[in-house]
Amino acid sequence: MREADEQYFETLETQLEAAFDVAERAKERGGDPKPEVEIPTARDMADRVENILGIDGVAERVRELEGQMSREEAALELVEDFVEGTVGDYDSREGKVEGAVRTAVALLTEGVVAAPIEGIDRVELLENDDGTEFINVYYAGPIRSAGGTAQALSVLVADYARALLGIDQYKAREEEIGRYAEEIDLYDKDTGLQYSPKEKETKFIAEHMPIMLDGEATGDEEVSGYRDLERVDSNSPRGGMCLVLAEGIALKAPKIQRYTRNLDEVDWPWLQDLIDGTIGKDEADEGDSAEDANGDDAGEGADDDGGDEADEQAGPPRVEPADKYLRDLIAGRPVFSHPSKSGGFRLRYGRSRNHGFATAGVHPATMHLVDDFLATGTQIKTERPGKAAGVVPVDTIEGPTVRLANGDVRRIDDAEEALAVRNGVEKILDLGEYLVNYGEFVENNHPLAPASYTVEWWEQDLAAAGADVQAMQDSPHIDLADPSAEEAIEWATEYDAPLHPKYTYLWHDVSIEQVCALADAVEDAQVAQADGAYADPEMDGTAGDAHSDDGALVLPRSDAVQQTLEHLLIGHTQDEETITVTDWVPLVRTLGFSRSLERDWTREDLSEHARTYGESESLDAIGVAEDAEREDGQNAIKAINEVAPFQVRERAPTRIGNRMGRPEKSERRDLSPAVHTLSPIGEAGGAQRDVAKATKHADDMSDTPGQVEVEVARRRCPDCGTETHQANCAECSGTTEPVYVCPDCEAEVERDESGRAECGRCETLASPTQYKVLDLQEAYRDALQNVGERETAFEQLKAVKGLTSEEKVPEPMEKGILRAKHDVSAFKDGTVRYDMTDLPVTAVRASELDVSAERLRGLGYTEDIHGDPLTHEDQLVELKVQDIVLSDGAAEHMLQTARFVDDLLEQYYGLERFYEFDDREDLVGELVFGMAPHTSAATVGRVVGFTSAAVGYAHPYFHAAKRRNCFHPDTRLWYEDENDDWEYGTIEELVESRLDDPQEDDFGTLVQELDGDLTVSSLGENGPCRQPVDAVSKHPAPDHLVEVAVGDRTLRVTPDHTMLRAGPDGIEEVPASDLAAGDDLPAYDGGETTTMTARGEASTAATDGAAPTDTVEAVEYVESDVDHVYCLTVADTHRVAVEGTYVGQCDGDEDCVMLLMDGLLNFSKSYLPNQRGGQMDAPLVMSSRIDPSEIDDEAHNMDIMDAYPREFYEATREMKDPTEVEDVMKIAEETLGTDREYTEFRHTHDTANIAAGPDLSAYKTLGSMEDKMDAQLEISRKLRAVVESDVAERIIEYHFLPDLIGNLRAFSRQEVRCLDCGESFRRAPLTGDCRECGGRVNLTVHEGSVNKYIDTAIRVADEFGARDYTKQRLKILERKIESVFENDHNKQSGIADFM
């Protein structure tokens, strides 16, 4: 590590230690669950392992061993330390084995939380039939997240510890061996295994395994043959055991054997038989394997041979257009380009400094000219190389080319100019360049697409042709990026090099016919000087000089010539009779003309190959011909190269289609609804959870106001014996401890070494909670007094209804009072958080961060990226790996949080204020926690500046992980399969049948991306719709699920699963754990399918009229009975209809940040929900240093070059695999483990401001959905690359029609509801009165919600030229709606009706 990097990390750690000292002093004084900071610091992986497991001495020993051996070897070496007692404090033998096994798994998973803590339940000592003892390791489902190698090694570690402790081997009984085989087979059928061993293999392993593999029962199925065994607790498959035996031992036998051979105490000779295939494999299997291997080789060879045929093709090499991103278009989110269509974004290779993975560089002028729908951080669905990307502004690429209302055509390379002219833009002829880095193609395993011919490629071609490019770059008189026309032509002819890209027009976008028509027009053209006189180009040496004002080419105007110039992207002006091109010499020379406008060729002189080149390009990806009469000769590049006196390259051979996805995000993260304190008040606070209201609540007149019964902790002070529910003793201020009581016999139970509290008499788990009546009036009054505040200090104090943590320790209400005062809310762990769309940046300028160069120097930025001293704000400096840039909104929120923290320290803890910020500049240099939600680990970051964009910028290594929320396997849903058939089945069947080649992450999640042919019913902003499924996934199941009862059906999901709840302001998204009885959920009535799913008894109208609602009858936590849960990734809406209810599904979490001192003071594990997954999103450990070798491989694939080599560009012309050019490219992976791993992140493109372009997408600023849709269609009209009728068709087909049909069906099947008592009836009472209370009943679905889009749909179909079939469908539907709502009895008739 460089000295500068070490100094940087030491600076962060010094600040961290100072904050820790203050927080520790505060914790000793307050009423927190623990008297110390609960977020341990980990400088490296060894620290994380120790902190996660809580075993003293592990980190130091791991560091000693890491330098001497591999992690696997270190895990085995640590076994001796546990057995000898030098590491860990275990009295029992089984405790030592358990400590060794957990540490091994933690070490091999680099500190990932789930596997070592939740994947190993316990270790027991049991007896063989001969009286000897053996080790039984009890695995749980989350061991899946450790991966096969760690699973298998955990067994080897247990065996090694057994041998060192002198414990005998496990001697399996015959029935147990048979049980293992039956159980593995049943588990594989029920849940699925990556590798399913043969029956002989399983029995062989079970017979020789020296450790008994056991585990928790999962699933509803039971074995049929080997039941009720003495040493097996359940008749159901044990998921953890099955995973370890099948995916660990059976699959990873070769790896395990490497380590068994080095251990004298352990001998597993039977592994060799397993590896040799003499057990459980037959010749047919081997033949298949050999065939597969040969097939792979043959495929590679075929690929190698195919590259030389490109020149013989009828057209140039092109990637196939792909329209998957267009499927199920969302109303209000524009299409920017149809697939690979001319006029769309032009692919340019490179990486800007604000560019990384899943990002796309777009010119800020383009962002403004598409009516601000694109902003920094806006997600776009894209044709390639990936499926989606976040937009980042890059102004060093080419901007869009537009035609103005007066007919002028110009390229806009300045955002200010774009704003000035956008009201006068008639057509966007070209969207400009689209910057994608090489690593994106590597990550997505996408063949390289032909590159645009750019300056960086041309310079290398010029050098290869013999020019001294370095001398030319050093010359003050030469600008290689922007040469004059005369210079460009001179270089091209002198060096026999391709023409400069500036003067290389898009000849591949025009046909031979168009070129010939343009040539004819040039032949008839004249050159006009500035004074209007026509000049003889041969006589006037200055005419046509791009840098003079005395020459312009005047062409006779015709539609064909105008269209050709527009497609070539040649700037020009025009009047009724002429078209004027100012920079004309390169054009006429490329067309084979002399300066005197003479040529020596005709169409007949062109070769047959040139005249027919590109015949395959007449149709685009959606089958729409741009020019129906064109049949061949679509690409004029061959013809141009035959007539031009120099080489001309294809300027932009690859166009990339895309459309808008999700808008950018920068907002506070609240629980739903937002609360200020994690103190329980039951139902007394009403829907708003209002504490003041709860203090006055009484169930009836005889009750004392404010007396509320809630479930809280049962605790006792160890000093004075006082029993309480608080973390602090009110009598002596000591820290109380939990008291576990058996629910059956009410005896107190002590926890064992593993933390379990099981009653020895009843064999029941004891509980640390109790139901207790709290006096909220007294608690509220005391809390206000303790912090010296009055009720007037805040508008409302909101609390939670109940606690979801294991011990149910309430948070001090004083903290909530101060949060309410400063308008910040508490997350589930007690912290205050802010979410931001995460974007990468590797170099920044002080000027764009709203800080001074002096301030940056104070943070250690002493020199710029070129090594020059940092003296002014415009210098570019390399961003340090843990420095982050906050959005303006985040900065304001941090200021509020800092004021809350200062008040907390002063008024509650009695210490000095810590921050004392006056304005946001004071935030610069302060530490924050950055949370990557899935990892349960916080990374310390430092604020270096601010951006007006609604995103958070950080180094690519300071990256985000994604969380997925899942369904129980038996969850049923409607889906339209790949054959366009509607099916109704379980999500498990849907997912498992499509896991063909899934990717596995560090947490055991299997993800299979789909091509969009699978469609589900969804709920968009304007009602029901159908959406494609982008991916399916399978995840390790949590210990508990949330079961939601709705009518006669139940829905089981993970506790953090996003649910949709109907509220007064429309549909809101909330975690499943936040639902309560009485909540209304949007109901699915079958959509466009022929069968309606079951509906509940209670139904009310959705607030937005888009769907009816069902009422939740009960919500409860239930133990998970499965080993895996499943989910879908639904495009755009991220919502899906399951079990008759619309719910949320997989959605990537943005990175969230929290102020350091807030996390240190207020985070507590005691507040976390008591369920598997409850510890996700929680900073269980914090990393003070990012280790590049430990982060996601995605970041390692990012290229870090300042220029791409010529070999790379040439390879793109052959569409080679990205791995074929890896030898000439440099990616971040190459610097791992060197002293350059934190530096030298070079980029190929700069940009003036990382926040350029609109601050917010127009999607967020426009009002109604109809306004958004009108803007969407208006953009379609302006964009040359968009077929507006196709956009209109898709909106109607995927939004309006499903909405109208669904709402009409809902109207016919609706329930009625009493306006007085709220009772619902499936059929309206004949009297019209409520049968319960006599009140008036009313419809729940009204006419307005049924026909609200019919007029709009018909208007769009007529205005934008939808197909007759679509118009007819709408007319038929309009008649159906009229027939439902028209009163036939009162219909007015004319005399003609009777004639």
From Swiss-Prot:
Residues 283-312 have a biased composition (Acidic residues). SUPFAM superfamilies: Hedgehog/intein (Hint) domain. GO terms for biological process: DNA catabolic process; DNA-templated DNA replication; intein-mediated protein splicing. The lineage of its organism: Archaea, Methanobacteriati, Methanobacteriota, Stenosarchaea group, Halobacteria. Heterodimer of a large subunit and a small subunit. It comes from Haloarcula marismortui (strain ATCC 43049 / DSM 3752 / JCM 8966 / VKM B-1809) (Halobacterium marismortui). This is DNA polymerase II large subunit. It catalyses: DNA(n) + a 2'-deoxyribonucleoside 5'-triphosphate = DNA(n+1) + diphosphate; Exonucleolytic cleavage in the 3'- to 5'-direction to yield nucleoside 5'-phosphates. Belongs to the archaeal DNA polymerase II family. Possesses two activities: a DNA synthesis (polymerase) and an exonucleolytic activity that degrades single-stranded DNA in the 3'- to 5'-direction. Has a template-primer preference which is characteristic of a replicative DNA polymerase. This protein undergoes a protein self splicing that involves a post-translational excision of the intervening region (intein) followed by peptide ligation. Its EC number is 2.7.7.7, 3.1.11.1. The gene is polC.
